[in-house]
C-alpha cells in the first residue's frame, strides 16, 4: 500500500512536468562515487520514461586535479578559479570529454536511456570569450595586481538548437563544460554557470543542482536548519548577509540568475541521498532547497 501511495503522490507532478525540460547538474558525490552516479543515471532515465526531458551538465574539478597530479603537473587556483594553460586545457578535455562524459553516457544507456555526449564546442553550443585577468589584492601591502587565468572562459551565448533536436528525438544530452570562442579556441568553463545558462537557453522548467550538502542551510554547520523553500529575494538577502558562502555561493548565484532568466524553479539537493532527484521532483516535501521567483 505504501508503494501505491507514493505513486499516487507522484501523479500530479508527472502530469505537471510532462514534456518539460529538466536541467540536472551532476556534481559532488554523484560524480566520484560509482554507486551514486549509477543511481543518479537511473533516476535520470526514469524522468525520461515518465515523459520529462532531462538534460545533464557535469563538472569534474577533482578528477582534473587528480589527472594533473598523475602527470606531474601541479594544479593552480586563483580564488577558486583554475589557471588553465594549454597543457592543462588538454588534460581538462581528456578528463571531461574523454572520461567523465563517456562514463555518464554509458550509465544512462545501460539503464535504458538514449544518451549522447556533447561539449560546448559541438554545433557552437556554448560560445564563450576569454575571461579578463583576475584582480587580486595583497593583504599586506594592499597592492592590486592582475593575473591571467589562461584559457578560462565566460559564456557569451547558448545555441539551444542541438539540444532541442536531441530531446525532440528522445535523446538525453550530456554536456561537458567546455566552450569555444569566435577564433575556435577551446575554453574551460564553470560547470554550475553552464548548467544555469543552458537551463535558461532551452527554457527549462527546473534547474536541479546535485551537491554534497542537504541544500541551503540557515546555519551552515547544522544540517537540521535546511531551508526547504525560498524566494530569489530572500536568498539574495542571505547571500548579502554572508550566510551563504564558500562552495555554495557560486551554486546559489547560478540558481538566482537562472530564475531571473526565466527558469521556473531551481533546486539544490544532496546527491549523496539515494534517489534524491526523484524525491525532490515527485514529493510535496522534497528533499532539498527549492528556489522560486
Swiss-Prot record:
InterPro entries: AceGlu_kinase-like_sf (IPR036393), AcgluKinase_fam (IPR004662), ArgB (IPR037528), Asp/Glu/Uridylate_kinase (IPR001048), Glu/AcGlu_kinase (IPR001057), NAGK-C (IPR041727). It is an enzyme of class 2 (transferase). It comes from the Archaea. Pfam families: AA_kinase. One of its GO terms (cellular component) is cytoplasm. It is found in: Cytoplasm. One of its GO terms (biological process) is arginine biosynthetic process via ornithine. The keyword Nucleotide-binding applies. Keywords: Amino-acid biosynthesis, Arginine biosynthesis, ATP-binding, Cytoplasm, Kinase, Nucleotide-binding, Transferase. It catalyses: N-acetyl-L-glutamate + ATP = N-acetyl-L-glutamyl 5-phosphate + ADP. The record marks 25, 251 as: Transition state stabilizer. Substrate binds at residues 60-61, 82, 188. Pathway: Amino-acid biosynthesis; L-arginine biosynthesis; N(2)-acetyl-L-ornithine from L-glutamate: step 2/4. One of its GO terms (molecular function) is acetylglutamate kinase activity. Its EC number is 2.7.2.8. HAMAP family: ArgB. Catalyzes the ATP-dependent phosphorylation of N-acetyl-L-glutamate. NCBIfam families: argB. Belongs to the acetylglutamate kinase family. ArgB subfamily. PANTHER family: N-ACETYLGLUTAMATE SYNTHASE, N-ACETYLGLUTAMATE SYNTHASE, MITOCHONDRIAL. This is Acetylglutamate kinase. It comes from Methanothermobacter thermautotrophicus (strain ATCC 29096 / DSM 1053 / JCM 10044 / NBRC 100330 / Delta H) (Methanobacterium thermoautotrophicum).
Amino acid at each position: 500500500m505504501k508503494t501505491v501511495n507514493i505513486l499516487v503522490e507522484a501523479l500530479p507532478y508527472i502530469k505537471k512536468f510532462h514534456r518539460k525540460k529538466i536541467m540536472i547538474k551532476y556534481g559532488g558525490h554523484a560524480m566520484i562515487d560509482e554507486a551514486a552516479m549509477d543511481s543518479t543515471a537511473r533516476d535520470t532515465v526514469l524522468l525520461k520514461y515518465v515523459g520529462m526531458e532531462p538534460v545533464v551538465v557535469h563538472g569534474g574539478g577533482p578528477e582534473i586535479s587528480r589527472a594533473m597530479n598523475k602527470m606531474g603537473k601541479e594544479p593552480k587556483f586563483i580564488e577558486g578559479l583554475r589557471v588553465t594553460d594549454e597543457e592543462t586545457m588538454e588534460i581538462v578535455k581528456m578528463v571531461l570529454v574523454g572520461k567523465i562524459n563517456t562514463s555518464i553516457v554509458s550509465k544512462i544507456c545501460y539503464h535504458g536511456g538514449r544518451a549522447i555526449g556533447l561539449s560546448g564546442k559541438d554545433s557552437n553550443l556554448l560560445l564563450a570569450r576569454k575571461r579578463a585577468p583576475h584582480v587580486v589584492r595583497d593583504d599586506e601591502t594592499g597592492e592590486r595586481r592582475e593575473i591571467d587565468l589562461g584559457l578560462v572562459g565566460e559564456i557569451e551565448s547558448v545555441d539551444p538548437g542541438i539540444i532541442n533536436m536531441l530531446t525532440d528525438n528522445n535523446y538525453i544530452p550530456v554536456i561537458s563544460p567546455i566552450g569555444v570562442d569566435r577564433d575556435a579556441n577551446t575554453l574551460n568553463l564553470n560547470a554550475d554557470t553552464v548548467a544555469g545558462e543552458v537551463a535558461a537557453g532551452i527554457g527549462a522548467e527546473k534547474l536541479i543542482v546535485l551537491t554534497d550538502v542537504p541544500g541551503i542551510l540557515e546555519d551552515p554547520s547544522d544540517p537540521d536548519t535546511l531551508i526547504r523553500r525560498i524566494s530569489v529575494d530572500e536568498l539574495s538577502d542571505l547571500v548579502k548577509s554572508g550566510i551563504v558562502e564558500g562552495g555554495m555561493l557560486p551554486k546559489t548565484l547560478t540558481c538566482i540568475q537562472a530564475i531571473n532568466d526565466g527558469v521556473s524553479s531551481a533546486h539544490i539537493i544532496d546527491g549523496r541521498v539515494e534517489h534524491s532527484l526523484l524525491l525532490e521532483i515527485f514529493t510535496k516535501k522534497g528533499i532539498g532547497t527549492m528556489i522560486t521567483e
